[in-house]
Curated annotation (Swiss-Prot):
This is DEAD-box ATP-dependent RNA helicase 57. PANTHER family: ATP-DEPENDENT RNA HELICASE RHLE-RELATED, RNA HELICASE. It comes from Arabidopsis thaliana (Mouse-ear cress). Residues 525-541 have a biased composition (Basic and acidic residues). A motif (Q motif) lies at residues 141-169. ATP binds at residues 185-192. The gene is RH57.
Length: 541
């Protein structure tokens, strides 16, 4: 066989007899000049210049050496390698995308939590609890986030609310998210709208199925005021807000009475429950306004009766007050589930917009003289004066009547009509001075009270905060003067601490007094009169 044929068939055992016709075709075919060239599939094409015969290596099919890693890759193999790289790269990118999808919500959640924390810090909002909703940025969010009806936003605008107050920013989203809460915010900070607004949004539309919301207030005056404020907010809707009055308890058929929101004092509501005149099983919202007063020992049985009557398993309870003692907080947690705690500013502190001062009067006679002197120097009505009891309210009223001062008086012995008349005259400016007991210190909103005078030393820090809170409401400035006598000195330190926490200056000697364990400070006081004691004794004889 020729050399070229040998190369072609080298390493094979070809049966020439069996494949004779085919072999003849190959042998007789015309061969090109290039056919004599050696074919090598494992090295690059030889250059045109012929190399010596010795340098031409014939690679045996039995012993094929693997190509070194430095050799140029075959095009076909390189394509497969690049496709593997592409697949590996694609998988890596896919994994990164999946990780980003998982991480992005976490990052966004963390950013949102940071924004919420900054907003709360800006408005001195302190919260504790789980999964707390973000505070409101504006009232417009009530529509975008919660589907608030237009009439509520219109009424808020007409009432002069441009931006939510701090308590409204946080309490409204909490209640709208279906959570229970107890909130402590300074007097005059808009707590009433903070619980009525979400109540109306969640109730959505009026219903004839019975009472769906109950608001409890410790005093009739506060209940009446809450009803007035609520009716301002439902203007333009078909909601019905009713105040529980004495005639209503006696004569009303609550099964036929159209009432969405009922506002009452605990005693009146308890009477209606005991008489089986009212069904509270469908109540969706229960609000305890001025809850620290409602949880006092004298009202606990009444509150317990109302709470049991509101038996709806999905009811949402909320507590609002200007002060939140630890004992009240503990009781609140016993009737609430997974509640959020909201504190605006510092807990149990007076409003920072009220200028506070202590005045030593020495004795009961000295207090009356100090009051007359303050009126002579600068009577800047309207002025609210607080005394310890209804007897002392009557005595002070008799004294001021003789001074030709346009004064009114309100206490629990007066019939409801006279009490309402006294409050209305004071609001209208017909009376410059209103003498009151602590019954009116809770939540009553008198626009523009310039001065509060604690004629009798308050019996607790909580009472002090609520009293002076009638002034300096809704960001206005005000003044609070507290008279004290020798028998009040042991309790000065407690009030001084409250004053300091709201930024007021207190004499150093008062802060050096021993801090006394606080109890109700209601000393027996002499009657209010300008007559000297000797003259009083002569008159008695």
């Amino acid at each position: 066989m020729e050399k070229s044929s040998y190369f072609l068939f080298g390493g094979t055992n070809f049966n020439k007899k069996k494949f004779a016709p085919d072999f003849a075709k190959f042998k007789n075919s015309t061969e090109d000049d290039d056919s004599n060239k050696k074919v090598n599939f494992f090295v690059e094409e030889e250059e045109d210049t012929e190399q010596p015969e010795a340098e031409k290596v014939i690679v045996s099919s039995k012993k094929r050496k693997r190509r070194s890693s430095n050799s140029v890759p075959v095009e076909g193999f390189d394509v497969f390698k690049s496709s593997k790289k592409a697949r590996a790269k694609g998988k890596a990118e896919e994994q990164i995308t999946k990780n980003e999808i998982v991480e992005n919500p976490k990052k966004e959640l963390n950013r949102q939590m940071e924004r919420d924390a900054l907003s709360r810090k800006q408005y001195s909002i302190h919260v504790s609890g789980n999964n707390i909703p973000p505070p409101l940025k504006s009232f417009a969010e009530l529509s975008s986030r919660y589907g608030c009806e237009g009439y509520i936003l219109r009424n808020l605008a007409e009432l002069g609310f441009k931006e939510p107050t701090p308590i409204q920013r946080q309490a409204i989203p909490i209640l709208l998210s279906g959570r229970e809460c107890f909130a402590c915010a300074p007097t005059g900070s808009g707590k009433t709208f903070a619980f009525i607004c979400p109540m109306l949004i969640k109730l959505k539309r009026p219903s004839t199925d019975g009472i769906r919301a109950v608001i409890l207030s410790p005093a009739r005056e506060l209940a009446a005021q809450t009803a007035r404020e609520g009716k301002k907010l439902i203007k333009g809707s078909n909601f019905h807000i009713r105040l529980m009055t004495k005639p209503l308890v006696k004569t009303a058929d609550f099964s036929k009475l159209w009432c969405d929101v009922l506002i009452s004092t605990p005693m009146r509501l308890k009477r209606a429950i005991k008489a089986k005149k009212i069904d509270l099983s469908k109540v969706e919202y229960l609000v305890l306004d001025e809850s620290d007063k409602l949880f006092e020992q004298s009202l606990l049985k009444q509150i317990d009766c109302v709470v049991k009557a509101c038996s709806n398993p999905s009811i949402i309870r909320s507590l609002f007050s200007a002060t939140l003692p630890d004992s009240v907080e503990e009781l609140a947690r016993s009737i609430m589930h997974d509640a959020v705690r909201v504190i605006i500013g510092r807990k149990n502190t007076a409003s920072e917009t009220v200028k506070q001062k202590l005045v030593f009067a020495g004795s009961e006679e000295g207090k009356l003289l100090a009051l007359r002197q303050s009126f002579a120097e600068s009577l800047n009505p309207p002025v609210l004066i607080f005394v310890q009891s209804k007897e002392r309210a009557k005595e002070l009223y008799d004294e001021l009547k003789c001074e030709n001062i346009r004064a009114g008086v309100i206490h629990s012995d007066l019939p409801p009509g006279e009490r309402e008349n006294a409050v209305d005259q004071f609001r209208a400016g017909e009376k410059w001075v209103l003498i009151a007991t602590d019954v009116i210190a809770r939540g009553m909103d008198f626009k523009g009270i310039n001065c509060v005078i604690n004629y009798d030393f308050p019996d607790s820090a909580s009472a002090y905060i609520h009293r002076i809170g009638r002034s300096g409401r809704a960001g206005r400035s005000g003044e609070a003067i507290t008279f004290y006598t020798e028998q009040d000195v042991p309790f000065l330190r407690n009030i001084a601490n409250t004053m300091m926490s709201s930024g007021c200056e207190v004499p150093s000697w008062i802060m050096s007094l021993k801090k006394k364990k606080w109890r109700k400070h209601r000393p027996r006081r002499d009657s209010i009169s300008t007559k000297p004691k000797a003259d009083k004794n002569d008159t008695d004889e």
